[in-house]
Amino acid sequence: MKKLFALLLAAMMALSLVACGGSSDTTSDSTDSAAGNTEEPVTLTAIVAGLTEDSPSGEALKKFAELCNEYSGGSVTIDCFFNTELGNVSACVESTAQGTIDIVSTGTSYFAGYVPAIQVFELPYVFASYDEAHQTLDNEPGKAIADLFESTDLKMLCYWESGMRHVTNSRNPIITPADMSGLKIRTVVSATQQATWEAFGAIPMALDMGEVFTALQNHTVDAQENTLSSITSYKMYEVQDYLSMTYH
């Protein structure tokens, strides 16, 4: 079986996983089938990078692995990993491109180095509703972005979403953009995200997800923005005083 290069993208919420295999061994596969042989069992490595096992994304990956094994008659096994078990998020994406990891699921910003156009999903308020997001990603706009991965070492399998994003901080309630003036907020390594928060008057600081809780606890940063599931999974409420439902 061809080594699987896979990509599962989170656009804004979560719970839909799709996987596919390669086709470089078409000739040998056809010969084996004609001879009545079955393909040897294969084990794939998959990680939900930057999210915990008990998050919706983590639970979805485990269910995906279970179904793959069931529908393949036991010939496909997926070893599931979570959060930073195989390295930080950026390292997991790079390892997937190199073939060390077979499947990675994480936020769109981590793939900007492969497909810069995907940064459009980093803009706030691009979609007015969940339905609009799904319609966009499931049709031509989403397909156009997915097609750009064909010239990279990654193959995009699907979009999924884990919820609208919201801001937490330890300084003050955020009612208007002016309330963010001078607020040190954690972002991912994304020029689009950083420019967005600067436009709101905040001071963006790029940190890997595995570093965020400690940075908030030590007041290296004042704030972070994430989905409610991530805020809960990482127990951000233990080190943050305010949750602003910004739906960005």
Question: Whereabouts are the PLM-identified features?
Answer:
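Short, low-complexity disordered leader/linker segments with a strong preference
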Residues: 1-43
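Residues in and immediately flanking transmembrane alpha helices
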Residues: 15-16, 142, 197
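A gly/proline- and charged-residue-enriched helix-loop-helix capping module
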Residues: 128-148
